[in-house]
Amino acid sequence: MPSTNQIIINTSPLIALVAAMGDLKILESLYTDVLVPFEVYQEILIGGTTGFAIAEFQSASWLQKQSSPLTISPLLFNSLDLGEASVIQLALNKNISTVCIDEAVGRRIARLSGLSVTGSIGILLRAKREGYPLSIKTAIQKMLNHNIRLSQTVIDFAIKEAGESS
């Protein structure tokens, strides 16, 4: 059974978790090691149009932010955005079995690369199962309020899985 103490995380889930929870402490409570590829670190610092989540990301000193760019395989580089490609490449390089990616194509390629995949909703559900005090409905609403895109299928699944169906 692969260890679920280590995870490599992409940009979108980092931003989604800050939107849902207000910080990244949930990751610290679930994982011994949370690695952030250099490429993801750069994407976060650029901050999109709003700069959302930069302060929370920088204050999470326990995150293992990689200090140098990766050499990414041409297959990953040509198939995915830089963040997703770097998450999968770092996982393969460091023999870490679990990655956190929200985008469908990145998730598919991670699985084809032999990796276990979770996403921002998967992390929230695991936290709830392990006793972290949170409402999945509230977390999802906060994500939607910050323009995090979630399909109705994912929302319905998460609420049902969390036992929060009405």
Question: What are the residue ranges of the model-derived segments?
Answer:
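Active-site-proximal, substrate-binding regions of enzyme catalytic domains
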Residues: 2-97, 104-107, 111-115, 138, ...
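Hydrophobic alpha-helical interaction segments
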Residues: 119-163
